[in-house]
Protein backbone atom coordinates (compact mmCIF):
# COMPACT_ATOMS: atom_id res chain seq x y z
CA UNK A 1 0.00 0.00 0.00
CA UNK A 2 2.72 2.50 0.99
CA UNK A 3 4.79 1.74 -2.11
CA UNK A 4 1.78 1.85 -4.41
CA UNK A 5 0.56 5.20 -3.13
CA UNK A 6 4.04 6.71 -3.22
CA UNK A 7 4.56 5.56 -6.81
CA UNK A 8 1.22 6.90 -8.00
CA UNK A 9 1.49 10.26 -6.23
CA UNK A 10 5.11 10.85 -7.26
CA UNK A 11 4.31 10.15 -10.92
CA UNK A 12 1.25 12.41 -10.83
CA UNK A 13 3.27 15.25 -9.28
CA UNK A 14 6.24 14.88 -11.62
CA UNK A 15 8.95 13.92 -9.13
CA UNK A 16 9.12 10.14 -9.56
CA UNK A 17 12.85 10.47 -10.35
CA UNK A 18 13.45 11.36 -6.69
CA UNK A 19 11.94 8.15 -5.28
CA UNK A 20 13.73 4.83 -5.05
CA UNK A 21 12.64 1.52 -3.56
CA UNK A 22 14.60 -1.28 -1.94
CA UNK A 23 12.84 -4.60 -2.47
CA UNK A 24 13.20 -6.88 0.55
CA UNK A 25 12.91 -10.64 0.51
CA UNK A 26 12.55 -13.18 3.31
CA UNK A 27 16.31 -13.50 3.70
CA UNK A 28 16.59 -9.76 4.27
CA UNK A 29 13.93 -9.89 6.95
CA UNK A 30 15.55 -12.85 8.73
CA UNK A 31 19.19 -11.75 8.49
CA UNK A 32 18.72 -7.94 8.31
CA UNK A 33 21.27 -7.86 5.49
CA UNK A 34 19.33 -5.04 3.84
CA UNK A 35 20.59 -2.71 6.55
CA UNK A 36 24.14 -3.17 5.26
CA UNK A 37 23.04 -2.35 1.71
CA UNK A 38 21.12 0.86 2.45
CA UNK A 39 24.22 3.12 2.83
CA UNK A 40 25.73 1.70 -0.38
CA UNK A 41 22.43 2.13 -2.21
CA UNK A 42 22.22 5.77 -1.11
CA UNK A 43 25.77 6.39 -2.32
CA UNK A 44 24.99 4.86 -5.72
CA UNK A 45 21.83 6.95 -6.06
CA UNK A 46 23.65 10.18 -5.17
CA UNK A 47 26.51 9.40 -7.57
CA UNK A 48 24.15 8.59 -10.44
CA UNK A 49 21.94 11.66 -9.97
CA UNK A 50 22.40 14.54 -12.41
CA UNK A 51 22.12 16.98 -9.51
CA UNK A 52 23.44 16.09 -6.08
CA UNK A 53 20.61 16.07 -3.53
CA UNK A 54 20.69 18.36 -0.50
CA UNK A 55 19.31 15.71 1.83
CA UNK A 56 18.23 12.08 1.70
CA UNK A 57 15.20 10.75 3.56
CA UNK A 58 14.95 7.03 4.29
CA UNK A 59 11.34 5.94 4.76
CA UNK A 60 10.64 2.73 6.67
CA UNK A 61 7.46 0.71 6.83
CA UNK A 62 5.96 -1.65 9.38
CA UNK A 63 8.48 -4.39 8.55
CA UNK A 64 11.32 -2.50 10.23
CA UNK A 65 9.02 -1.53 13.07
CA UNK A 66 8.35 -5.20 13.80
CA UNK A 67 12.06 -6.02 13.43
CA UNK A 68 13.00 -3.27 15.88
CA UNK A 69 15.47 -1.77 13.41
CA UNK A 70 17.74 1.00 14.72
CA UNK A 71 17.30 3.20 11.67
CA UNK A 72 18.94 6.18 13.37
CA UNK A 73 22.21 4.22 13.35
CA UNK A 74 21.71 3.14 9.73
CA UNK A 75 21.12 6.75 8.65
CA UNK A 76 24.18 8.01 10.54
CA UNK A 77 26.27 5.40 8.74
CA UNK A 78 24.76 6.43 5.41
CA UNK A 79 25.41 10.12 6.14
CA UNK A 80 29.09 9.36 6.75
CA UNK A 81 29.15 7.38 3.50
CA UNK A 82 27.78 10.16 1.26
CA UNK A 83 28.64 13.32 3.19
CA UNK A 84 25.02 14.50 3.15
CA UNK A 85 22.30 14.68 5.80
CA UNK A 86 20.35 11.40 5.87
CA UNK A 87 17.12 11.47 7.86
CA UNK A 88 14.95 8.52 8.94
CA UNK A 89 11.21 8.77 8.46
CA UNK A 90 8.92 6.24 10.10
CA UNK A 91 5.87 5.36 8.02
CA UNK A 92 4.43 2.84 10.46
CA UNK A 93 0.72 2.27 9.93
CA UNK A 94 0.79 0.21 13.13
CA UNK A 95 1.15 3.47 15.07
CA UNK A 96 -1.89 5.12 13.50
CA UNK A 97 -3.92 5.06 16.72
CA UNK A 98 -0.98 5.90 18.98
CA UNK A 99 0.67 9.10 20.16
CA UNK A 100 2.86 9.37 17.07
CA UNK A 101 0.93 8.25 13.98
CA UNK A 102 2.67 8.29 10.56
CA UNK A 103 1.74 11.83 9.53
CA UNK A 104 2.91 13.18 12.90
CA UNK A 105 6.23 11.34 12.54
CA UNK A 106 6.68 12.60 8.98
CA UNK A 107 6.17 16.22 10.01
CA UNK A 108 8.68 15.86 12.83
CA UNK A 109 11.22 14.29 10.45
CA UNK A 110 10.73 17.03 7.85
CA UNK A 111 11.78 19.76 10.31
CA UNK A 112 14.48 17.72 12.08
CA UNK A 113 17.30 19.12 9.90
CA UNK A 114 16.82 22.69 11.08
CA UNK A 115 19.79 23.96 13.09
CA UNK A 116 19.90 26.73 15.66
CA UNK A 117 20.27 30.25 14.24
CA UNK A 118 19.84 33.76 15.51
CA UNK A 119 16.11 34.38 15.63
CA UNK A 120 14.43 37.33 13.93
CA UNK A 121 11.54 39.18 15.53
CA UNK A 122 9.88 39.72 12.15
CA UNK A 123 9.90 36.06 11.02
CA UNK A 124 7.32 33.32 11.52
CA UNK A 125 6.84 29.75 10.27
CA UNK A 126 3.49 28.26 9.29
CA UNK A 127 3.46 24.59 10.27
CA UNK A 128 0.71 22.17 9.42
CA UNK A 129 0.43 21.29 5.76
CA UNK A 130 2.70 20.00 3.02
CA UNK A 131 1.18 22.50 0.59
CA UNK A 132 0.69 26.26 1.07
CA UNK A 133 -2.35 28.19 2.22
CA UNK A 134 -4.43 29.81 -0.49
CA UNK A 135 -2.67 32.94 -1.73
CA UNK A 136 -5.51 35.26 -0.69
CA UNK A 137 -5.76 33.88 2.86
CA UNK A 138 -6.17 36.74 5.32
CA UNK A 139 -3.63 35.19 7.71
CA UNK A 140 -0.79 36.60 5.58
CA UNK A 141 -2.26 40.09 5.81
CA UNK A 142 -2.91 39.82 9.55
CA UNK A 143 0.67 38.74 10.21
CA UNK A 144 1.91 41.70 8.18
CA UNK A 145 -0.34 43.96 10.26
CA UNK A 146 1.54 42.61 13.30
CA UNK A 147 4.89 43.56 11.76
CA UNK A 148 5.90 40.16 10.41
CA UNK A 149 7.99 40.50 7.23
CA UNK A 150 9.11 36.91 6.67
CA UNK A 151 6.35 34.28 6.55
CA UNK A 152 7.79 30.88 5.73
CA UNK A 153 6.06 27.64 4.75
CA UNK A 154 8.03 24.55 3.83
CA UNK A 155 6.02 24.14 0.62
CA UNK A 156 7.06 27.62 -0.55
CA UNK A 157 10.78 27.11 0.08
CA UNK A 158 12.58 27.32 -3.27
CA UNK A 159 15.74 25.53 -2.13
CA UNK A 160 17.43 23.97 0.88
CA UNK A 161 18.85 27.30 2.08
CA UNK A 162 15.35 28.78 2.26
CA UNK A 163 14.30 25.75 4.27
CA UNK A 164 17.20 26.25 6.70
CA UNK A 165 16.13 29.89 7.15
CA UNK A 166 13.05 28.60 8.98
CA UNK A 167 15.36 28.34 12.01
CA UNK A 168 15.27 32.15 12.24
CA UNK A 169 11.57 32.28 13.14
CA UNK A 170 10.49 34.18 16.22
CA UNK A 171 7.65 31.68 16.64
CA UNK A 172 5.79 28.91 14.85
CA UNK A 173 2.12 29.02 13.95
CA UNK A 174 0.70 25.50 14.19
CA UNK A 175 -2.26 25.18 11.80
CA UNK A 176 -2.84 21.42 12.03
CA UNK A 177 -2.82 19.17 15.14
CA UNK A 178 -0.47 16.72 13.43
CA UNK A 179 2.28 19.38 13.59
CA UNK A 180 2.15 19.81 17.36
CA UNK A 181 4.93 17.32 18.00
CA UNK A 182 7.13 18.92 15.32
CA UNK A 183 6.56 22.32 16.95
CA UNK A 184 7.34 20.87 20.38
CA UNK A 185 10.55 19.37 19.02
CA UNK A 186 11.56 22.72 17.50
CA UNK A 187 10.88 24.46 20.78
CA UNK A 188 13.12 22.01 22.65
CA UNK A 189 15.94 22.03 20.08
CA UNK A 190 15.79 25.58 18.70
CA UNK A 191 13.91 27.48 21.45
CA UNK A 192 11.24 28.54 18.94
CA UNK A 193 7.88 28.78 20.76
CA UNK A 194 4.59 28.05 19.05
CA UNK A 195 1.01 29.31 18.87
CA UNK A 196 -1.80 27.14 17.56
CA UNK A 197 -4.62 28.31 15.29
CA UNK A 198 -7.41 25.91 14.33
CA UNK A 199 -9.03 25.67 10.91
CA UNK A 200 -12.74 26.34 11.38
CA UNK A 201 -15.72 27.22 9.19
CA UNK A 202 -17.75 29.33 11.63
CA UNK A 203 -16.95 32.99 10.95
CA UNK A 204 -17.78 34.02 14.53
CA UNK A 205 -15.39 31.42 15.95
CA UNK A 206 -12.72 32.42 13.43
CA UNK A 207 -13.12 36.07 14.46
CA UNK A 208 -12.90 35.14 18.14
CA UNK A 209 -9.75 33.09 17.51
CA UNK A 210 -8.11 36.00 15.71
CA UNK A 211 -9.06 38.23 18.64
CA UNK A 212 -7.22 35.94 21.05
CA UNK A 213 -4.28 35.74 18.65
CA UNK A 214 -4.25 39.55 18.46
CA UNK A 215 -3.89 39.79 22.26
CA UNK A 216 -1.10 37.21 22.29
CA UNK A 217 0.73 39.15 19.57
CA UNK A 218 0.18 42.45 21.35
CA UNK A 219 -1.06 44.01 18.11
CA UNK A 220 -4.37 45.18 16.69
CA UNK A 221 -5.37 42.78 13.92
CA UNK A 222 -8.39 43.75 11.83
CA UNK A 223 -10.08 40.73 10.24
CA UNK A 224 -13.48 42.43 9.85
CA UNK A 225 -13.33 42.97 6.05
CA UNK A 226 -12.63 39.27 5.54
CA UNK A 227 -15.34 38.26 7.99
CA UNK A 228 -17.90 40.50 6.30
CA UNK A 229 -16.96 39.12 2.88
CA UNK A 230 -17.40 35.53 4.13
CA UNK A 231 -20.75 36.31 5.76
CA UNK A 232 -21.97 38.02 2.59
CA UNK A 233 -21.04 34.94 0.54
CA UNK A 234 -22.93 32.69 2.97
CA UNK A 235 -26.00 34.93 2.89
CA UNK A 236 -25.93 35.09 -0.90
CA UNK A 237 -25.86 31.28 -1.10
CA UNK A 238 -28.75 30.91 1.35
CA UNK A 239 -30.78 33.53 -0.47
CA UNK A 240 -30.31 31.65 -3.74
CA UNK A 241 -30.69 28.03 -2.59
CA UNK A 242 -32.23 28.09 0.89
CA UNK A 243 -31.66 25.46 3.61
CA UNK A 244 -30.52 22.66 1.28
CA UNK A 245 -29.86 19.14 2.56
CA UNK A 246 -26.14 18.42 3.00
CA UNK A 247 -23.94 15.38 3.67
CA UNK A 248 -20.39 16.00 4.91
CA UNK A 249 -17.46 13.58 4.73
CA UNK A 250 -13.99 13.52 6.24
CA UNK A 251 -12.05 13.20 2.97
CA UNK A 252 -11.77 16.95 2.55
CA UNK A 253 -9.87 19.97 3.85
CA UNK A 254 -11.46 20.37 7.24
CA UNK A 255 -12.97 18.61 10.21
CA UNK A 256 -16.31 17.07 9.26
CA UNK A 257 -17.88 17.75 12.65
CA UNK A 258 -16.69 21.37 12.77
CA UNK A 259 -18.00 21.99 9.26
CA UNK A 260 -21.33 20.34 10.11
CA UNK A 261 -21.73 22.56 13.17
CA UNK A 262 -20.89 25.68 11.15
CA UNK A 263 -23.20 24.89 8.22
CA UNK A 264 -26.03 24.00 10.61
CA UNK A 265 -25.53 27.34 12.36
CA UNK A 266 -25.74 29.13 9.00
CA UNK A 267 -29.10 27.47 8.38
CA UNK A 268 -28.28 24.52 6.12
CA UNK A 269 -29.91 21.16 6.77
CA UNK A 270 -27.02 18.79 7.53
CA UNK A 271 -28.35 15.24 7.26
CA UNK A 272 -25.27 13.01 7.49
CA UNK A 273 -21.65 13.10 8.66
CA UNK A 274 -19.02 10.55 7.63
CA UNK A 275 -16.08 10.75 9.98
CA UNK A 276 -13.94 9.16 12.66
CA UNK A 277 -15.22 10.21 16.07
CA UNK A 278 -12.43 11.38 18.39
CA UNK A 279 -12.43 13.03 21.81
CA UNK A 280 -12.29 16.44 20.09
CA UNK A 281 -15.32 15.57 17.97
CA UNK A 282 -17.63 15.36 20.97
CA UNK A 283 -17.48 19.13 21.51
CA UNK A 284 -19.06 19.66 18.09
CA UNK A 285 -21.37 16.65 18.48
CA UNK A 286 -22.88 18.17 21.63
CA UNK A 287 -23.52 21.41 19.75
CA UNK A 288 -25.14 19.50 16.90
CA UNK A 289 -27.27 17.47 19.31
CA UNK A 290 -28.75 20.70 20.64
CA UNK A 291 -29.49 22.22 17.22
CA UNK A 292 -30.06 19.19 14.99
CA UNK A 293 -30.36 15.93 16.88
CA UNK A 294 -31.48 13.98 13.82
CA UNK A 295 -28.08 14.07 12.07
CA UNK A 296 -26.74 10.59 11.32
CA UNK A 297 -23.05 9.91 11.97
CA UNK A 298 -21.27 7.13 10.08
CA UNK A 299 -17.73 5.77 10.38
CA UNK A 300 -15.90 5.12 7.12
CA UNK A 301 -13.75 2.59 8.98
CA UNK A 302 -16.68 0.37 9.89
CA UNK A 303 -17.14 -2.79 7.74
CA UNK A 304 -20.89 -2.26 8.06
CA UNK A 305 -20.59 0.60 5.55
CA UNK A 306 -20.63 -2.14 2.91
CA UNK A 307 -24.37 -2.26 3.54
CA UNK A 308 -24.89 1.50 3.47
CA UNK A 309 -28.10 2.39 1.65
CA UNK A 310 -28.46 5.76 -0.03
CA UNK A 311 -31.96 6.29 1.31
CA UNK A 312 -31.40 9.86 2.53
CA UNK A 313 -32.24 12.63 0.07
CA UNK A 314 -29.25 14.95 -0.13
CA UNK A 315 -28.84 18.00 -2.37
CA UNK A 316 -25.12 18.59 -1.82
CA UNK A 317 -22.27 16.30 -0.73
CA UNK A 318 -19.03 17.81 0.59
CA UNK A 319 -15.96 15.56 0.60
CA UNK A 320 -14.99 12.77 -1.74
CA UNK A 321 -16.41 10.08 0.56
CA UNK A 322 -19.76 11.85 0.91
CA UNK A 323 -19.85 12.23 -2.88
CA UNK A 324 -19.29 8.48 -3.24
CA UNK A 325 -22.23 7.71 -0.96
CA UNK A 326 -24.48 10.22 -2.77
CA UNK A 327 -23.67 9.99 -6.50
CA UNK A 328 -26.81 11.89 -7.54
CA UNK A 329 -26.18 14.93 -5.36
CA UNK A 330 -24.17 18.00 -6.34
CA UNK A 331 -20.54 17.44 -5.33
CA UNK A 332 -17.87 19.62 -3.75
CA UNK A 333 -14.83 17.40 -3.19
CA UNK A 334 -13.01 20.17 -1.28
CA UNK A 335 -9.75 18.21 -1.26
CA UNK A 336 -7.54 20.53 -3.30
CA UNK A 337 -3.80 20.68 -2.57
CA UNK A 338 -3.85 24.42 -1.81
CA UNK A 339 -5.15 24.69 1.73
CA UNK A 340 -8.17 26.85 2.67
CA UNK A 341 -8.01 28.63 6.01
CA UNK A 342 -9.86 31.29 7.97
CA UNK A 343 -12.54 33.59 6.59
CA UNK A 344 -11.23 33.20 3.06
CA UNK A 345 -11.63 29.45 3.46
CA UNK A 346 -15.33 29.98 4.21
CA UNK A 347 -15.69 32.37 1.27
CA UNK A 348 -14.05 29.92 -1.12
CA UNK A 349 -16.11 26.99 0.19
CA UNK A 350 -19.43 28.72 -0.42
CA UNK A 351 -18.32 29.87 -3.86
CA UNK A 352 -17.50 26.24 -4.70
CA UNK A 353 -20.86 25.17 -3.28
CA UNK A 354 -22.57 27.73 -5.50
CA UNK A 355 -20.77 26.42 -8.57
CA UNK A 356 -21.69 22.84 -7.66
CA UNK A 357 -25.35 23.72 -7.24
CA UNK A 358 -25.26 25.40 -10.63
CA UNK A 359 -24.44 22.02 -12.11
CA UNK A 360 -20.65 21.78 -11.99
CA UNK A 361 -18.79 19.02 -10.12
CA UNK A 362 -15.90 20.62 -8.24
How would you describe each model-predicted region?
Residues 1-362:
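An N-terminal assembly and electron-transfer interface module characteristic of large anaerobic redox
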